[in-house]
């Protein structure tokens, strides 16, 4: 397997409960390395742009409101098959369906407040990383 990068967001429900360290530890324990990280409070424009793919979906407005409701931690993760590895440790979107030991099973409050976002493909990872990070901010 090749070493690749993926993008992760620790969402407001998790940062509000001071879970940034616990979530990051689970990611690192899964073999992912944090090569860039910053805590930000997304603007409405940032959230709408980031989630533009969902603009026509009925949950778009609620998603944007949730993502701007508090600080988030955006991260670039690196490791072998990083997208898949990150998605495996995150667990299913719906925490009720997530496997034991995953981030969402352990920390998510609901399907909406599910603690983390992770890229779903290498292509989307590259786009999402570039949305929040300049190349010089990523230190491998």
Swiss-Prot record:
Drop me one GO molecular function for this one: ATP binding
First-listed, main subcellular location of the protein, grouped into a coarse class? cytoplasm
A Gene Ontology annotation in the biological process aspect, one of them, is:
CTP biosynthetic process
PROSITE patterns to which the protein is assigned, alphabetical:
NDPK_LIKE
Key words of the record:
ATP-binding, Cytoplasm, Kinase, Magnesium, Metal-binding, Nucleotide metabolism, Nucleotide-binding, Phosphoprotein, Transferase
Q: Which reaction is the catalytic activity of this chain?
A: a 2'-deoxyribonucleoside 5'-diphosphate + ATP = a 2'-deoxyribonucleoside 5'-triphosphate + ADP; a ribonucleoside 5'-diphosphate + ATP = a ribonucleoside 5'-triphosphate + ADP
Q: Which cofactors are required for activity?
A: Mg(2+)
User: SMART domains annotated for this entry?
Assistant: NDK (SM00562)
Q: Quick check: keyword Membrane in the entry?
A: no
Q: Where is the active site?
A: 117 (pros-phosphohistidine intermediate)
Residues the record lists as binding ATP: 11, 59, 87, 93, 104, 114
Enzyme Commission (EC) number: 2.7.4.6
**Sequence similarity:** Belongs to the NDK family.
State what this protein does: Major role in the synthesis of nucleoside triphosphates other than ATP. The ATP gamma phosphate is transferred to the NDP beta phosphate via a ping-pong mechanism, using a phosphorylated active-site intermediate.
**Name of protein:** Nucleoside diphosphate kinase
User: Which gene is annotated as encoding this protein in its UniProt record?
Assistant: ndk
């Amino acid at each position: 397997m090749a070493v690749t990068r993926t993008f992760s967001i620790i969402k407001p429900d998790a940062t509000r409960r001071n879970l940034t360290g616990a979530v990051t530890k689970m990611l690192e324990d899964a073999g992912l390395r944090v090569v860039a990280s910053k805590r930000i409070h997304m603007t409405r424009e940032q959230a709408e742009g980031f989630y533009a793919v969902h603009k026509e979906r009925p949950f778009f407005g609620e998603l944007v409101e949730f993502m701007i409701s508090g600080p988030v931690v955006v991260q670039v993760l690196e490791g072998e098959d990083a997208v898949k590895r990150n998605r495996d440790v995150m667990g299913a979107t719906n925490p009720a369906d997530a496997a034991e030991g995953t981030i969402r099973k352990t920390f998510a409050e609901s399907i909406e407040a599910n603690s983390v976002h992770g890229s779903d493909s290498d292509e989307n990872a590259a786009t999402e990383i570039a949305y929040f990070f300049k190349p010089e901010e990523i230190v491998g």
